[in-house]
Amino acid sequence: MVHPLIPQLESLARPLAAQLGYQLVQMVFHTNQHPPVLRVDIRPLDPDRETSHADCEAMSQALEVELDRVDLIPGQYVLEVSSPGISNLLTSDRDFVVFKGFAVEVTLDPPYKGKAVWSGHLLGRDEERVALSLKGRRVQLPRASVQRVALSSETD
């Protein structure tokens, strides 16, 4: 369940990240820890760069100033800024560009042509379709039915 403050916190952090040259990937507020932890995952807008310690530090310092200014989070908390690492789920436009040619598994609901799960090599994604290569044959899956696209180690 998403913490109720996350939408406000994201609307504060997203433009700040962009101004510094980063993409806000995810923000999670772990209130079951004492003190609570606000985890912010960023990555550079430049797809040829990896997230560095200096990137995390710059975002942390800038975000800390803004969070103190708006005072949305009551009490003490820990701000943790890091890289999302490598996730096997593809969600952003950038993911679909970076992982073009990689083996993926696509889950659909409703199924397409009687299949709910398709495996192949990613060719790309546009507004209407996710394109895969299945043993050299191009298949275009309806994007509206795609529930998840994950990196895979095998293709059938």
Swiss-Prot record:
GO terms for cellular component: cytosol. InterPro entries: Ribosome_maturation_RimP, RimP_C, RimP_C_sf, RimP_N, RimP_N_sf. Keywords: Cytoplasm, Ribosome biogenesis. Gene3D superfamilies: RimP-like superfamily, N-terminal. Coiled coil: none annotated. It is found in: Cytoplasm. GO terms for biological process: ribosomal small subunit assembly; translation. The keyword Cell membrane does not apply. The keyword Cytoplasm applies. NCBIfam families: PRK00092.3-3 (NF000935). Belongs to the RimP family. Required for maturation of 30S ribosomal subunits. This is Ribosome maturation factor RimP. The lineage of its organism: Bacteria, Bacillati, Cyanobacteriota, Cyanophyceae, Synechococcales.
